[in-house]
Amino acid sequence: MKAVRFHEHGPREVLRYEDVPTPSPGAGDVLVRVRACCVNRFDVSLRQSGSRKSLPLPWTLGVEFAGEIAALGSGVTGVLEGDRVWVLHELPCLECRYCLDGMDNICEAARMWSVQMPGGYAEYVSA
């Protein structure tokens, strides 16, 4: 698949359109065929100067994206291949006290696209 990545921090000229392996959805995950991804100020800042956490380079940004489900990992229910989805900027753990109380918007261990996980500047993302 193709992805837009950077190998060093800097201006937009550091972005490269590259071939990378297509991810496979793990248990409980889906493979999203990305159809749209915004250029977010957060992503621009990460590319230009990094963050408090070091990103493993090369890296794929894209904190906000949408698409359709291309494949289902084992155990996935409630969605079908072809369903259109919008991917929330953070992935809650679903195990902390807040997630268990239905307040996953304040999850204690949420992972964020573009920071802890490669983002949507790619043809496919496992989510």
How should each PLM-predicted stretch be described?
Residues 19-21, 126:
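Generic structural detector for well-ordered beta-strands
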Residues 16, 26, 81, 120-121:
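A generic structural signal for well-ordered coil/turn residues at beta-strand boundaries
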